[in-house]
A protein has these predicted regions:
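Intrinsically disordered, low-complexity RNA-associated tracts
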Residues: 1-72
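His/Asp/Glu-rich metal-coordinating catalytic cores
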Residues: 66-140, 145-257
Length: 257
């Protein structure tokens, strides 16, 4: 009986060791993505310094932590004004404002409800844009679906602002602008995933994502107040139609910034 008990105990220990090793491997993989390893090591180093330096070490370590991890920012607010796309499908248009600079993110249309007879499309109410027309630095686009770019021909007839988007997104937009006879009046700027564009107080960073349409991007707005991440429509796809997977690593880096 004793031998049997010893055997069972040994087997249990071996099984536990295997489980622990597997768990550590999983945790390590997650940590590499999220940056937990780096944070844990920093915390361990701070704890060691605290133990050796006493109270003064605590003050220095905590002060250093605040300095390293808190982004520099101002007390001036960022104003975020959605003109469409909330609690509805379509009409995605969001305005970001900081002091005298404004940026438009996406400019989509919506299809009419069944009871809206005689209406072909619905676009956002752009009355507010007329109030800030001289402060709009540009329009940035996430992808080429109608609910994100469909209103642009109507908006660009009233505002002369540069437009930024990926090659496919602008290719689709060009056809629309040509139909409306304003293609030569609009300044279109082709960007690639990874590019950064300075627009007044904003720096728009374009990050590759996956969606049901190729060449989609998320947009990280770097501002004096902090970073605003607008993912756009996206999915995590291991076999994306444009061969490149969503840039999760960059999302993780932005989370640490």
């Amino acid at each position: 009986m004793k031998n049997n008990n010893d055997t069972r105990q040994n087997n249990n220990k071996q099984a536990q060791n295997v489980a622990n090793k597997m768990a550590h491997k999983v945790v390590d993989k997650i940590a590499k993505i999220s940056g937990v390893n780096e944070k844990t090591n920093n915390n361990n180093n701070r704890n060691k310094n605290n133990n050796s330096n006493g109270k003064n070490g605590n003050r220095n370590s905590n002060g250093g932590n605040r300095k390293n991890n808190t982004p520099k920012h101002t007390d001036k607010p960022i104003r975020i004004i959605p003109l469409g796309g909330l609690n509805e499908i379509g009409k995605n248009l969001t305005v970001f404002e900081y002091e005298d600079d404004a940026l438009i993110l996406d400019c989509g249309m919506a299809f009419p409800d069944d009871d809206m007879l005689g209406v072909d499309i619905v676009i956002p109410d752009i009355t507010y844009l007329h109030k800030i027309a001289d402060r709009i630095r540009g329009i940035v686009l996430t992808h080429g679906h109608e609910d994100h770019i469909g209103a642009l021909p109507y908006v660009l007839k009233e505002f002369s602002v540069p437009v930024y988007g990926t090659r496919l997104t602008l290719g689709i937009l060009k056809n629309k602008l040509k139909e409306h006879g304003i293609l030569n009046q609009v300044k279109l700027n082709t960007i690639n995933a990874g590019d950064k564009v300075k627009l007044g107080a904003f720096t728009a960073e374009f990050i590759h994502t996956n969606h049901s349409i190729a060449d989609a991007v998320a947009i990280a707005l770097h501002t004096p107040t902090g970073i605003i991440l607008h993912t756009g429509d996206f999915k995590i796809d291991s076999t994306p139609i444009d061969s490149d997977m969503i840039d999760l690593a960059r999302f993780g880096e932005l989370g640490k910034e």
